[in-house]
Amino acid sequence: MATQRRDESPSGLSDIVEPDGLLGIGLTSRHIEAFGRKVTSTAGHLMGPITDSSNGSHYHTAMADIHRELRRPTTQRKVFSLTQTSPTDLVRSKLSTSEIQSRALSSVPDELLANIPEDSSSYSLFEGFKATQDDHEFRKAHRRRSSKGKKLLKDGEAAGALPSAPTDLKKERDLLSRRLDLMGVRKNMCSSEIHEIDNKIANLHNIRKIVLDRLAGLEMEEAELEHQLTEIDNKLEDIQEEAPKTPLTAATPKSSSVNDDSVVSEDAALDASFMSESIYQKLPSHSPRSLKQRSIRKRSMPILHEHFAPGSQIKEMQAHTDMVTAIDFDYPFGTMVSAALDDTVRVWDLNTGRCTGFLEGHNASVRCLQVEDNIVATGSMDASVKLWDLSRARTVTRDNRLNKPSEGEGEDDNASDAFSLFSATTLEDCYVFSLDAHVDEVTALHFRGNTLISGSADKTLRQWDLVKGRCVQTLDVLWAAAQASTLAADTQWRPSGRLPDASADFVGALQCFDAALACGTADGMVRLWDLRSGQVHRSLVGHTGPITCLQFDEVHLVTGSQDRSIRIWDLRMGSIFDAYAYDKPITSMMFDTKRIVAAAGENVVKVYDKADGHHWDCGAGVGADESGPAPATVERVRLKDGYLLEGRKDGTVAAWTC
């Protein structure tokens, strides 16, 4: 390189001028040589011999002045203080930070100035600075100037116009003009800030969307890993249960036929007694699965829906071909069970939106159901209640086509898609047992722990022991016979929404907790029962139509009725805490810690915020195009942890954030 080598020359000096100079300060070797010659000649001239006539007395006079100055006490003190100063203090700059910055910015290379982008702003930087200054002093001065020349008018005096000097008016005009210009600059600055904030918000929305997609992928992967882990745990349990049986059976010697008969009879007796101990042992005879009930517990709950805006749709599924009569799920993005008037009960994976199988066994449509962990209870119009254990599921591929075309008919693409939509699997070995004590359709049920309560159109409530699998108590509503004729003659209690030509369900809704039972019936009353005594503890009167839904917690009980109202009761006082109404009868309702959701005969879900009392709509009917087909009416709703499910009249089930 030219900057790193020297050309050989007789003088030993470089003849090449370095472009950057020495020490980065622009000096070259030629400059240094010239400076050296000047110093040598100057020193020789000043300090030459005294006899030299060419040298004057300047040097001697200067040295004499310096000698006299050094003999002064003030100068000597300064010299002594300088000797005690450290080298760092000697080279330390005495300039302030602002002065250093000013000097550093006072000289800017042309290369940097050429890269400055052109500003499209209509005002200069100085104007923007002036616009940011507070005009408080101007307002004070303006008030003082405007108050000059004013005086208190006495009674009877007219308020005449006071003349002002032209110079004052011109100054006032110029001042107002400058302020008006500043207002324009401030407006432009605010507009620029708003555009900048909008751009930042748009970028943040894009980043949020990317992170949400990543979270969705993580939850999908988490669900897959938990599924694989559950399968491995089940296999390990099967191996541990079958391992002790093999050596025991191999080491048992053969006995006589008499002993064999006795052993068989004893085993049969033991099996009979063991089978009566638990309902979970009553499985089909062909099932080789373990009799132990397995519970699948998630290590972490899904949180994706918590980051969506309220009212956002998560997923939509064409679950059935007819009106949805009952839906329930265990937890957000978990397992959902749905029933409809197409006489099917389907199990769905809410994470993927796929149907995992069917629960077959009822002879009619299912009117009510409940999902708790892996246990599903279904109540049907065939007057039976069946329990299912989804952890024992064994899938068998089947075809559940409805209205299958004949062999001679051609199937177009749309028809084939519709038929393949409901081709799924049968969940065999899920059936546990059936409760068949009712004599009419089961319209409501609820179970908690080992107790299940069912309500039927036969005007009875039955309490079931899920350990023994039998009915332990029947609650006969004494006023059922008297109300039967009233319900048949009174037309105002006939529903006007879901089933206009059928009478209301006698037992519309119920819920139990330990020994407490709340039941809503067709007479509009809510009765609180004590299961220990079988007596009504309290009756809540207020609705004027049949009760269709209810739910309670530690403090409040919420009921929905065909009288179009939802009432919130205080269980401690037995009085109404709050109430509100909609335009149509309430067919379904549920609440969580924040909101109450209800199906009120419309194509949207009615949402009520407990905190601020705000009402808003959620569902496909919000913002729907009036020219297009309207969404179907919402019939059933379920809500857990802000995750909302709605079942519609056309068989569609959709998930929303709430």
Curated annotation (Swiss-Prot):
Residue stretches in coiled coil: 209-246
InterPro entries: G-protein_beta_WD-40_rep, WD40/YVTN_repeat-like_dom_sf, WD40_repeat_CS, WD40_repeat_dom_sf, WD40_rpt
Biased composition, class Basic residues, residue ranges: 139-151
Domain of life: Eukaryota
Keyword Membrane listed: yes
Biological processes per GO annotation: mitochondrial fission; peroxisome fission
Gene3D superfamilies cross-referenced by the UniProt entry: 6.10.280.220, YVTN repeat-like/Quinoprotein amine dehydrogenase
Alphabetically ordered keywords of this record: Coiled coil, Membrane, Mitochondrion, Mitochondrion outer membrane, Repeat, WD repeat
Location of the protein in the cell: Mitochondrion outer membrane
Lipid metabolism among keywords: no
Function: Involved in mitochondrial fission. Acts as an adapter protein required to form mitochondrial fission complexes. Formation of these complexes is required to promote constriction and fission of the mitochondrial compartment at a late step in mitochondrial division.
Sequence similarity: Belongs to the WD repeat MDV1/CAF4 family.
Name recorded for this polypeptide: Mitochondrial division protein 1
Species this protein is from: Aspergillus fumigatus (strain ATCC MYA-4609 / CBS 101355 / FGSC A1100 / Af293) (Neosartorya fumigata)
Lineage: Eukaryota, Fungi, Dikarya, Ascomycota, Pezizomycotina
